[in-house]
Amino acid sequence: MRISFQNVEDAAMSSYQNLRAIVIDAVREYCAEHYFRPYIWVEVDSACRVPTEYVKDGMIILDIDDEAVRGFQMNDEYLSFEARFGDETDSMEIVVPLNRIVHVAAAEQAVEGASFMASPTSPELLEKLTGSSVAPRRPMRIK
């Protein structure tokens, strides 16, 4: 069997995103144990479903604490939840590919979080997230 560079790169990217999900889960658990609020810093692209009025210089910071969001779900490709912003009474569905998350930390200790490099969203994931329904391939981790 011949392994191409592309196959190795795909496998590495899959592991990298999986590691990101594990780190995000760990930070959320740490924050819950210490009564902190977990935040993510997102480098927004067209696959991100976020309120654009809060995006500054291509970035948005989101509170992912259980008290701030409803229905938090995460798989190896993206996370999603519902949240309200500003004075809005209706909640908005937020969807963020994991490859666009550049930092995760407790709001109270932002410099002690974990940082990542943003990578381009794959065409397949972009199509999945911008289509009419968002359906993950793997079982969701629900907190």
Question: Which residues does each predicted region cover?
Answer:
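Eukaryotic intrinsically disordered, low-complexity regulatory linkers and tails enriched in Ser/Thr/Pro
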Residues: 1-143
